[in-house]
C-alpha cells in the first residue's frame, strides 16, 4: 500500500488492554481492523469482519455490497461515501452520532472483540478513493512545524513494517499462549504513568479563562464546527500539543489560528466539497416512474441509433464468408468464427469485426497468422493490411473494402470465444442486458474510458460489469454459476473450479480436486480427467420468478452501484460467484479496478487501467452521471403558450423595460445570484450571459429606483459607488422557466468570473402530503407551504470579446444550466433531503479555478452576512419549481456566434457604457399548494440524453504512459524506449585510435584470463571433492563446466560443478531436492569448506559453499547435463579464432564495470553476453566464426538428444577450413570488431523484432518464438525454450542499453591524449562514471539481505540460516552465558566494523549502500517528547542491528556484510578492483557502486 495506508499501532500493557484507545479513535477515526486467521496471513478468503455492520440511513436505497468482506469503514470509500458508513455530519445531533459511530465501530463490547480473534489485528486506514500517493503525503503536510514533526517522522519510520507489527501483536493479551510479553521495568512504567497523567488533563483549561474569553472561545469553536473541526476530549499521545481535530482531513490542530489557516487550505476545501457531493448523491431518492420512463427512452434512442441490428450482423457474417474464401487455398484445414460484439450484439454499428482462426494442432499460431497476413495482402476485398504481433493477443488488422469496417484476425483465441459465447447466450435469454450494456458502453465511449491503449478499460469489460451488477442486485436478475449448492464448493477451493463451456442455455463447470494446488490463485491448467467433476448451471432464472424491472431503473441502479456501493479498490468483479472476492485471495494488487474474465480467471482484464488519475476520472464520471439521471430533468416545450413572464432589467443611466408583446417561456441566463459584473466605461459588450432561473410566482412588478429596494421578495441593494446598477425582477407563472438574456460585459483582456454558493435551507413547518403521484416518491410536496431559501450566486460567466473564447463560454453555460437545474429539481424533495444536500449543489471539481481564486482577488462582490438572512426571510416570493429543460436544448456544438435576440428575451441594454453591476443577494422561494392540474404530471416533460459534457463536466482523462507511468504521452511515444534515442554520428576511426582499441582488448584478456596453474588448481579441487563425496554417495562423478572450462573464465571466478551418479543417465527417478539436502549435510563434514547453503527452490537445485584454501565459491548442481554441452560448444568457438576470446573478455570486463553482468541481481549473465558476442561475429560481413550447429557432412542434420534437445554441433575444429568456405576471410582487427559490436547492438539490431540465436544464420523473429513480451531475447543454443533475457525488467533493460550507447560514444570517438585523472587507457575506457552516467544499476527487484532477485528479504535463505543458527545457540543444552557472551562479542565486532567503514567512507567522500540503516531519531525539544521517542528508537536500532547481523559473507563466513563487500573479495589478485578500480578516478567511482 505504500504511503496510502501506514499502519498505526496501539501500545498495550499487561494490566489493562489498549492504552489510550479513546485517543486512538479520535486521532484516527477512519481506521478499522481486519481479523485474519493465522493460515491466511492476509491472503485468505476466510477473512471476517472485526466490527459490527452499520445500518443504512433511511434516505438511502439499494443494496450495499461494500459491506462484504470488510468492516464498515475499512474500505477507501467509507469516509467519503455516507451510503456505506453514515458519518456524523449526516444528522443534526452530530455530537452524539459521532460518539456512537466511533464507539460502535472501534470500541465495541468485550464479547464482540473476543468473538473475532483468530489472528493478529491489521489496521486499515480508510482513505478516499480519489486520494493518490501524493495526496496522502499532503495529508500530514500541515502538521509540519506545529510541534508534531518529530512524532510524525517516527510514526512513518518506525510503524511502517507489517512484520514488526505482527511481532508486537504476538505479545498482545489475546495471543499470550503463543508468546509471553516481558514485563516492563519499573522505571519505564513510572514514566508511562507520568505521561498518562499529563495526557489525562483537559485539553483546554476553561477554569483559568474569564467569562469574556470563554464566550469568545465558544463562539470560535461553534464556527469551527461548521467546518467539521472539533475540540479533542483528550490529548493524543502522538501529538500532545494538539487541541482540535479536523474530521474531514483526519488532522490534528494546535490552536484556533491554525484551525482557521487549515480551513483556508485547498485540501480542506476539496474534502469539504467532496463531502457535500457525497451527501447529495447518497441522499438522492429512487427515481419516480416518470423519470424511469424518460431514462428508458434515452437508452432506447441510443440503442436505435448506435446499436447492432439484424442487417448489421448479416453484414459481418458476409465479411467472414468472404474472408473464408480468401483463406481457403492457403489454410484449407482452418475455419473462421466471429467473436466479440459482432456475435453478442453488445456493441456498436462501427465496432471492429473480430474473427478468430481455428487451426489444427500440427500448426502454430505464428505460422497461421503469417499466412493470414500474406493472404489478405494478396486479396482485393481487403485493404490497409497490417499486423500487431507484439500485442497480448497477436492480430492481423485489415479493413473491409466494401463496408469500411475494421477487421482484426486472431488465431486460437479460445478464451475470448468462450466469453463471447457466454455473453451471447445471456443477451438472448435476458433481453434487458443488451440495451443496458450498449448504454454502458456508449457512456464509456463518450467519456473516453474504453481505450485500453490509453490507460482505459477494454470495451467488453463493461458487459461483465453489467452482468455482475444484475447478479448482485437485492433482487437479482441473473444467477451465479458457482455456489453452496455444489457439494465441494467453498471460497478456499474457488481456484479448483473453472467454467468450460455454454451448452443449451447452461454453463458447464468443472471441479478438480487439487489438494496441493495454490488456492490463492485460480487454476487455468487443464486438470486430469480422472479427478475432474463436471456440472451444469442454468444461465438465467425461471421467467416466472424474474421481477419486472424496466431498463431505465436498472441503468440508474447500475450507476449508483458502481459510484457509491461497490468497493472497487478492495474487491474483484467476478460473475462466477455471489460471494464477494477480495483481491488478496487472487493475489492482485489493490487500487483501481479488478475484473475477472470468467474463462481466464488468472488475468485481471482491467489491468490496462494502470494509473490513478484515470481511475479517479472514471469515478468522477460515474458520480456525475448518476447525479444527472437520478435528478428530474424537464424538457422545454416552445410550442406551449403561457402567460407572459416579464423580466425587467434596469441599468443606470440606461434603463429599459420590455413590456410589449408576449415574453418567451424560458430565458437563458447562465447563473442568477449574488454577483457583481463590472465593466470598464465605454467598452462595447459582446456575447451573452445566460443562466437558468427558477420559476417564480406569476407576479409582475416594475423595478424602482437604483436605491435599496424590496421588490416582490427579491432583495436588491444598489451600490451607490458604482457608475451603474442593474436590478432585475423575474417572475413567471406555472411550470415553465423564465428566461432572460443579459449582454455580457468585458474586454479582450478582462474576464468576469462568478463564484457560486448554494445554501438551500428549509423550515420544517406546515408540511403536508401531496396527492401528485410523482412527488409522493420524493417524500414531500412542491406545492406545500414551506419556506425554502434558495440562494443562487452567479458562477463563472466569462466575458468574451473574441471568437476564441466562445467555446469556453458555451461549456460554462451548459454546466451552469445543469447545476441550476439540479438545484431547482431538489425543490420537489423532502425538506430533510434539501437541508442535507443544499450545500453540495454547485460542486466544482476544477482545481485550476481554485488556484486562480487563491492567486487573484475575486472580481465579483459576494455579500453574504449573517444579518442579511433575517432580511431575506422577511421578503419571500411564493413560487414553485417544475423542472427545467434548458440543458437539453444546448449541446456541445452550439454556435456562440449567434447574435442575441433582444426582441425575444428580456434584454438588459445594448452597448452599455460605464460599470454594469448586478447584485442579487437573495432569491427566496415560498412554496404554496397549487391545484393538482398545475403539477407536473406529464411523463413527456422528463427528458434525458447522453452527452459527453453532461457526464464529464468538461474533464478529460489524463494520458499516462503504461511504460514509465508518467503523464503526457502514450507507450508508443515513451522517451524511455531505448530505440527512440537519437544517436550522434561517429567520426571515422583513425589508425592510431584503432591500435589503441586493439591494445585495450588484448590487455583485458591478459589481465583476467586464468593461468595454467589456476586451471590445474581447479581440477585438483574437483578431484578432492569427488573423492570426499564418494564416501557417502558411491558412484558419484563431478564434472567442471561453465567459465572454468569454456575458455572465457576469469581469475577467481566461481567454480561450477555438475554432479552425476553412475547408473542414472538422467535425473529421472531421483529426488533432486532431497539429494541436494543430503549432499549439503555431507559437505558440512569437510573441514576445508565453509558456509554450505543448499538452494532447493531454484530452477536447478544447487549447493553453494566456500572453499577456504583457494578462496573460490563453488556451486554443485545435479544433472545439469545441458550445461556441460553448452560448455563444449563455447569452448569450440573460442578455439576457432583468438579474436573470439579477446572480444568475450572485453565484453565481460565492460559488463562488470557497468554492473550489468550478474543475472542473480536482475541483469544478464556473463554466458548471455558471450552469446551476444558470438552472434555478432556470426552476423559480421564477412563472418568471423561459423554457425557450428548448421555444419554437418551428411544430407540430414544429425540428432543427439539430451533432455529432449538436439545437442549436435560440428566439433572438429581442425577440419573447419575445408567445411566452411568463409574461413579466414574476415581480417578486421579486434579493436575495430569491438567498436563494431557496440554499434551493431545500438544501431542495427532490432531487439523488439529479432532473437539473438547462435544456432542459425538466418534471422529469427520474436513473434516466431512467441517471446514478444520481453525486451532482450537471447535463445539458448540447445534448450530452445530458454530465454536468457526473460528476467530483465524495463529499468534494467534501459540501464544496459544506456551503457552500450555510452560505450559506443567512448570507444567510437578518437582522443589524442588521455585525461590526467585517468592515468591508464583501461581506466579511461572503462570508467563507470561515464558508461553509466554515475547511476547505480536498478536494484528494486533485489533482496535487501543478499542482493539477489527471485525472493524478498523475508524469504531470504541467508536469513533462515541465521535464524537456525541462533536457535541452535539458544537450545537448553548450551549454557546461556556462553551464547550470550558469543553473541555480544559478534555484535561488538559488527559495530566496530561499521564504525570503521563509515569513518573511511567519510574520508573518501563515499556513501556505502550496505551500511547499517539505523539512524537516531532527532530528539524533540521538550522532555515529554523525548520520553515518547526513546523506547521505539532503541527498539528499531536493535532491529536494524539484527538485520545487519543476518547478512553473511560467502567468502570469509563473517556476519554483517555480503561477498561483494568482503575485503578478501576486493583485494583478490586479478580481480577488477585490483586492476582498474585503484587507478585514478575509476577507483573512487567503482568503490562507490560496490559499497
Curated annotation (Swiss-Prot):
InterPro entries: MTPAP-like_central (IPR054708), NT_sf (IPR043519), PAP_assoc (IPR002058), TUT4/7_NTP_transf (IPR045100), Znf_CCHC (IPR001878), Znf_CCHC_sf (IPR036875)
Effect of loss of the gene: Double conditional knockouts that have deleted both TUT4 and TUT7 at the secondary oocyte stage are infertile. Females ovulate normal numbers of oocytes with normal morphology of antral follicles but with a slight decrease in the frequency of surrounded nucleolus state oocytes. Mutant oocytes are unable to support early embryonic development, they fail to complete meiosis I properly.
GO function terms (MF aspect): miRNA binding; RNA uridylyltransferase activity; uridylyltransferase activity; zinc ion binding
Region (Disordered): 165-203, 740-774, 834-911, 1362-1399, 1463-1491
Sites where the protein binds Mg(2+): 1054, 1056
Cofactor: Mg(2+); Mn(2+)
GO BP annotations, alphabetical order: miRNA metabolic process; oocyte maturation; polyuridylation-dependent mRNA catabolic process; pre-miRNA processing; RNA 3'-end processing; transposable element silencing by mRNA destabilization
UniProt keyword annotations, A-Z: Cytoplasm, Magnesium, Manganese, Metal-binding, Nucleotidyltransferase, Phosphoprotein, Repeat, Transferase, Zinc, Zinc-finger
Basic residues bias (residue ranges): 178-187
Keyword Manganese: yes
GO CC terms, sorted: cytoplasm; cytosol
Location, primary (coarse class): cytoplasm
Keyword field contains rRNA processing: no
PTM-bearing positions, type Phosphothreonine: 64, 865
Reaction catalyzed: RNA(n) + UTP = RNA(n)-3'-uridine ribonucleotide + diphosphate
Residue stretches of biased makeup (Acidic residues): 844-857, 885-897
Localisation: Cytoplasm
EC number: 2.7.7.52
Biased composition (Basic and acidic residues): 1377-1399
Zinc finger (Matrin-type) in chain: 244-274
Binding-site residues, UTP: 1043-1046, 1053-1056, 1126, 1148, 1166-1170, 1282
Function, as annotated: Uridylyltransferase that mediates the terminal uridylation of mRNAs with short (less than 25 nucleotides) poly(A) tails, hence facilitating global mRNA decay. Essential for both oocyte maturation and fertility. Through 3' terminal uridylation of mRNA, sculpts, with TUT7, the maternal transcriptome by eliminating transcripts during oocyte growth. Involved in microRNA (miRNA)-induced gene silencing through uridylation of deadenylated miRNA targets. Also acts as a suppressor of miRNA biogenesis by mediating the terminal uridylation of miRNA precursors, including that of let-7 (pre-let-7).
PANTHER family: POLY A POLYMERASE CID PAP -RELATED (PTHR12271), TERMINAL URIDYLYLTRANSFERASE 7 (PTHR12271:SF34)
Family: Belongs to the DNA polymerase type-B-like family.
Name listed for the protein in its UniProt record: Terminal uridylyltransferase 7
Source organism of the structure: Mus musculus (Mouse)
Amino acid at each position: 500500500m505504500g504511503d496510502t495506508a501506514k499502519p498505526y499501532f496501539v501500545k498495550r500493557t499487561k494490566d489493562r488492554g489498549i492504552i489510550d484507545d479513546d485517543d486512538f479513535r479520535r486521532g484516527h477515526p477512519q481506521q478499522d481492523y481486519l481479523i485474519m486467521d493465522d493460515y491466511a496471513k492476509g491472503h485468505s478468503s476466510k477473512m471476517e469482519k472485526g466490527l459490527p455492520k452499520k445500518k443504512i440511513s433511511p434516505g438511502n436505497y439499494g443494496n450495499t455490497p461494500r459491506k462484504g468482506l470488510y468492516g464498515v469503514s475499512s474500505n477507501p470509500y467509507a469516509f467519503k461515501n455516507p451510503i456505506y458508513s453514515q458519518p456524523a455530519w449526516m444528522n443534526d445531533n452530530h455530537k452524539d452520532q459521532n460518539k456512537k459511530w466511533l464507539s460502535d465501530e472501534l470500541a465495541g463490547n468485550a464479547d464482540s472483540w473476543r468473538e473475532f480473534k483468530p489472528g493478529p489485528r491489521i489496521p486499515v486506514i480508510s482513505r478516499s478513493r480519489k486520494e493518490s500517493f501524493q495526496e496522502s503525503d499532503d495529508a500530514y503536510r500541515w502538521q509540519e512545524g506545529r510541534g508534531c514533526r518529530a512524532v510524525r517522522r517516527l510514526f512513518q519510520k518506525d510503524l511502517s513494517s507489517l512484520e514488526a507489527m505482527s511481532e508486537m501483536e504476538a505479545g498482545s493479551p489475546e495471543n499470550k499462549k503463543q508468546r509471553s510479553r516481558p514485563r516492563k521495568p519499573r522505571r519505564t512504567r513510572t514514566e508511562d504513568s507520568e505521561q498518562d497523567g499529563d495526557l489525562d488533563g483537559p485539553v483546554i483549561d476553561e477554569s483559568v479563562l474569564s467569562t469574556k474569553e470563554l464566550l469568545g472561545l465558544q463562539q470560535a469553536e461553534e464556527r469551527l464546527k461548521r467546518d467539521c473541526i472539533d475540540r479533542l476530549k483528550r490529548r493524543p499521545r502522538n501529538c500532545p500539543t494538539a487541541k482540535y481535530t479536523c474530521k474531514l482531513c483526519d488532522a490534528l490542530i494546535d490552536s484556533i489560528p491554525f484551525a482557521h489557516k487549515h480551513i483556508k487550505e485547498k485540501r480542506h476545501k476539496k474534502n469539504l466539497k467532496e463531502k457535500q457531493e457525497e451527501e447529495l448523491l447518497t441522499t438522492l431518492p429512487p427515481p419516480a416512474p416518470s423519470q424511469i420512463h424518460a431514462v428508458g427512452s434515452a437508452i432506447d434512442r441510443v440503442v436505435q441509433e448506435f446499436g447492432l441490428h439484424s442487417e448489421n450482423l448479416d453484414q459481418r457474417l458476409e465479411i467472414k464468408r468472404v474472408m473464408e474464401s480468401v483463406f481457403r487455398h492457403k489454410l484449407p484445414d482452418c475455419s473462421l468464427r466471429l467473436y466479440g460484439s459482432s456475435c453478442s450484439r453488445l456493441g456498436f454499428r462501427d465496432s471492429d469485426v473480430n474473427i478468430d482462426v481455428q487451426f489444427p494442432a500440427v500448426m502454430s499460431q505464428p505460422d497461421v497468422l503469417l499466412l493470414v497476413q500474406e493472404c489478405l495482402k494478396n486479396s482485393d476485398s481487403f485493404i490497409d493490411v497490417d499486423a500487431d504481433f507484439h500485442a497480448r493477443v497477436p492480430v492481423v488488422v485489415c479493413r473491409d473494402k466494401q463496408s469500411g469496417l475494421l477487421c482484426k484476425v486472431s488465431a486460437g483465441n479460445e478464451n475470448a470465444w468462450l466469453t463471447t459465447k457466454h455473453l451471447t447466450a445471456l443477451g438472448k435469454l435476458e433481453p434487458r442486458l443488451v440495451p443496458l450494456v450498449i448504454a454502458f458502453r456508449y457512456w464509456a465511449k463518450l467519456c473516453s474510458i474504453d481505450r485500453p491503449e490509453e490507460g482505459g478499460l477494454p470495451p467488453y469489460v463493461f458487459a461483465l460489469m453489467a452482468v455482475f451488477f444484475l447478479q448482485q442486485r437485492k433482487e437479482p436478475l441473473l444467477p451465479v454459476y458457482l455456489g453452496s449448492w455444489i457439494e465441494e464448493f467453498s471460497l478456499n477451493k474457488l481456484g479448483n473450479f473453472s467454467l468450460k463451456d455454454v451448452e443449451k442455455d447452461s454453463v458447464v463447470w468443472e471441479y478438480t480436486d487439487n489438494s496441493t494446488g495454490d488456492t490463492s490463485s485460480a487454476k487455468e491448467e487443464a486438470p486430469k480427467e480422472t479427478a475432474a467433476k463436471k456440472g451444469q448451471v442454468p444461465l438465467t432464472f425461471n421467467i416466472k420468478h424474474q421481477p419486472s424491472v424496466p431498463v431505465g431503473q436498472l441503468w440508474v441502479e447500475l450507476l449508483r452501484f458502481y459510484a457509491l456501493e461497490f468497493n472497487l479498490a478492495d474487491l474483484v468483479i467476478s460473475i462466477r460467484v455471489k460471494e464477494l472476492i477480495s483481491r488478496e485471495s487472487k493475489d492482485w494488487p489493490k487500487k483501481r479496478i479488478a475484473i475477472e474474465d470468467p474463462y481466464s480467471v488468472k488475468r485481471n482484464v482491467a489491468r490496462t487501467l494502470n494509473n490513478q488519475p484515470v481511475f479517479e476520472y472514471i469515478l468522477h464520471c460515474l458520480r456525475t452521471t448518476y447525479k444527472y439521471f437520478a435528478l428530474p430533468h424537464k424538457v422545454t416545450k416552445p410550442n406551449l403558450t403561457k402567460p407572459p413572464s416579464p423580466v425587467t432589467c434596469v441599468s443606470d443611466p440606461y434603463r429599459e423595460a420590455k413590456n410589449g408583446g408576449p415574453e418567451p417561456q424560458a430565458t437563458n441566463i447562465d447563473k442568477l445570484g449574488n454577483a457583481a459584473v463590472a465593466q470598464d466605461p465605454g467598452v462595447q459588450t459582446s456575447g451573452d450571459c445566460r443562466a437558468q432561473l427558477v420559476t417564480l410566482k406569476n407576479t409582475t412588478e416594475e423595478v424602482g429606483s437604483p436605491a435599496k429596494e424590496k421588490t416582490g421578495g427579491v432583495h436588491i441593494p444598489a451600490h451607490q459607488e458604482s457608475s451603474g446598477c442593474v436590478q432585475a425582477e423575474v417572475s413567471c407563472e406555472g411550470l415553465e422557466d423564465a428566461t432572460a438574456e443579459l449582454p455580457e460585459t468585458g474586454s479582450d483582456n478582462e474576464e468576469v468570473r462568478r463564484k457560486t454558493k448554494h445554501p438551500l435551507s428549509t423550515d420544517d413547518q406546515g408540511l403536508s402530503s401531496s396527492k401528485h403521484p410523482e412527488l409522493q416518491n420524493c417524500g414531500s410536496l412542491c406545492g406545500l407551504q414551506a419556506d425554502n431559501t434558495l440562494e443562487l450566486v452567479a458562477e463563472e460567466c466569462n466575458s468574451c470579446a473574441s471568437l476564441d473564447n466562445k467555446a469556453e463560454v458555451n461549456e460554462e453555460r451548459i454546466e451552469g444550466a445543469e447545476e441550476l437545474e439540479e438545484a431547482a429539481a431538489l425543490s420537489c424533495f423532502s425538506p430533510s433531503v434539501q437541508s442535507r444536500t443544499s450545500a453540495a449543489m454547485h460542486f466544482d471539481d476544477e482545481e485550476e479555478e481554485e488556484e486562480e481564486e487563491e492567486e487573484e482577488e475575486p472580481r465579483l462582490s459576494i455579500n453574504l452576512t449573517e444579518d442579511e438572512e433575517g432580511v431575506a426571510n422577511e421578503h419571500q416570493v411564493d413560487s414553485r419549481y417544475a423542472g427545467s429543460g434548458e440543458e437539453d436544448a444546448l449541446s456541445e456544438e452550439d454556435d456562440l456566434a449567434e447574435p442575441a435576440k433582444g426582441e425575444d428575451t428580456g434584454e438588459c441594454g445594448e452597448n452599455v457604457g460605464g460599470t454594469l453591476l448586478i447584485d442579487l443577494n437573495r432569491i427566496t422561494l415560498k412554496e404554496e399548494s397549487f391545484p393538482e392540474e398545475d403539477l407536473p404530471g406529464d411523463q413527456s416533460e422528463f427528458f434525458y440524453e447522453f452527452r459527453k459534457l453532461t457526464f464529464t463536466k468538461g474533464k478529460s482523462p489524463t494520458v499516462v504512459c503504461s511504460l514509465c507511468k508518467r503523464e503526457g504521452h502514450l507507450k508508443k511515444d515513451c522517451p524511455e524506449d531505448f530505440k527512440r534515442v537519437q544517436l550522434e554520428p561517429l567520426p571515422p576511426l583513425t589508425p592510431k585510435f584503432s591500435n589503441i582499441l586493439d591494445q585495450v582488448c588484448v590487455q583485458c584478456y591478459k589481465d583476467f584470463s586464468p593461468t595454467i596453474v589456476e586451471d590445474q588448481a581447479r581440477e585438483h579441487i574437483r578431484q578432492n571433492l569427488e573423492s570426499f563425496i564418494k564416501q557417502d554417495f558411491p558412484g558419484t562423478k563431478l564434472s567442471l563446466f561453465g567459465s572454468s572450462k569454456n575458455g572465457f573464465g576469469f581469475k577467481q571466478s566461481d567454480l561450477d560443478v555438475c554432479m552425476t551418479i553412475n547408473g542414472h543417465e538422467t535425473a529421472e527417478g531421483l529426488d533432486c531436492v532431497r539429494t541436494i539436502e543430503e549432499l549439503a549435510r555431507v559437505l558440512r563434514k569437510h573441514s576445508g569448506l565453509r558456509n554450505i547453503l543448499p538452494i532447493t527452490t531454484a530452477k536447478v537445485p544447487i549447493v553453494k559453499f566456500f572453499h577456504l584454501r583457494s578462496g573460490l565459491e563453488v556451486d554443485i548442481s545435479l544433472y545439469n547435463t545441458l550445461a556441460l554441452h553448452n560448455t563444449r560448444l563455447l569452448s569450440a568457438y573460442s578455439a576457432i579464432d583468438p579474436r573470439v576470446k579477446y572480444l568475450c573478455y572485453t565484453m565481460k570486463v565492460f559488463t562488470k564495470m557497468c554492473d550489468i553482468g550478474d543475472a542473480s541481481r536482475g541483469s544478464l549473465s556473463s554466458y548471455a553476453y558471450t552469446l551476444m558476442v558470438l552472434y555478432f561475429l556470426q552476423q559480421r560481413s564477412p563472418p568471423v566464426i561459423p554457425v557450428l550447429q548448421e555444419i554437418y557432412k551428411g544430407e540430414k542434420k544429425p540428432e543427439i538428444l539430451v533432455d529432449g534437445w538436439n545437442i549436435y554441433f560440428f566439433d572438429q575444429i581442425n577440419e573447419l577450413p575445408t567445411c566452411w568456405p568463409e574461413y579466414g576471410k574476415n581480417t578486421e582487427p579486434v579493436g575495430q570488431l569491438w567498436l563494431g559490436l557496440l554499434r551493431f547492438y545500438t544501431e542495427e539490431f532490432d531487439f523488439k523484432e529479432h532473437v539473438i540465436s547462435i544456432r542459425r544464420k538466418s534471422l529469427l523473429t520474436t513473434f516466431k518464438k512467441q517471446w514478444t513480451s520481453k525486451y532482450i531475447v537471447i535463445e539458448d543454443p540447445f534448450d530452445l525454450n530458454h530465454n536468457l533475457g526473460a528476467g530483465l525488467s524495463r529499468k534494467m533493460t534501459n540501464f544496459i542499453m544506456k551503457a552500450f550507447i555510452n560505450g559506443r560514444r567512448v570507444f567510437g570517438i578518437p582522443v589524442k591524449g588521455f585525461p590526467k585523472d585517468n592515468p591508464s587507457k583501461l581506466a579511461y575506457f572503462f570508467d563507470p562514471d561515464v558508461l553509466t552516467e554515475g547511476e547505480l544499476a536498478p536494484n528494486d527487484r533485489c533482496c535487501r539481505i543478499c542482493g539477489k532477485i527471485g525472493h524478498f528479504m523475508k524469504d531470504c535463505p541467508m536469513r533462515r540460516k541465521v535464524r537456525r543458527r541462533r536457535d541452535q545457540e539458544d537450545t537448553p543444552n548450551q549454557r546461556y552465558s556462553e551464547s550470550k557472551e558469543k553473541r555480544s562479542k559478534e555484535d561488538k565486532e559488527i559495530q566496530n566494523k561499521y564504525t570503521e567503514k563509515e569513518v573511511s567512507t567519510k574520508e573518501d567522500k563515499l556513501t556505502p549502500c550496505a551500511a547499517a540503516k539505523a539512524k537516531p531519531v532527532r530528539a524533540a525539544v521538550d522532555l515529554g517528547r523525548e520520553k515518547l521517542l526513546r523506547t521505539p528508537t532503541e527498539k528499531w536500532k536493535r532491529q536494524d542491528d539484527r538485520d545487519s547481523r543476518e547478512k553473511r559473507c560467502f567468502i570469509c563466513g563473517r556476519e554483517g556484510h555480503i561477498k561483494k563487500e568482503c575485503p578478501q573479495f576486493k583485494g583478490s589478485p586479478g580481480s577488477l578492483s585490483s586492476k582498474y578500480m585503484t587507478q585514478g578516478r575509476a577507483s573512487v567511482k567503482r568503490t562507490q557502486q560496490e559499497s
